[in-house]
């Protein structure tokens, strides 16, 4: 069970206004029920639009009105069994820090005040 934001990504430089957050989510054993986006480092979550709902992998989109402030964006997915993609901390607690092969924790991207994108760990 994993989702990842593919846009915006490292190397992009955003301008204030509407930003398309898009990505990909998948499950190895069942269908994806929904994808959620956080624009405040995981404090709150909003439902993203998903496409190809009938299969175990989906594309997702979310429109975010970025006001030029530094923020952290994340995605997480939920499958038909109501399992929620774990946080990085939950994966490390369960599997240790060297669990790179099956690492399915939530990935975080910082949008800096100047619009640059940076991959971070939280």
Where are these regions (language model features)?
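Long, low-complexity serine/threonine/glycine- and acidic-rich segments characteristic of extracellular
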Residues: 2-122
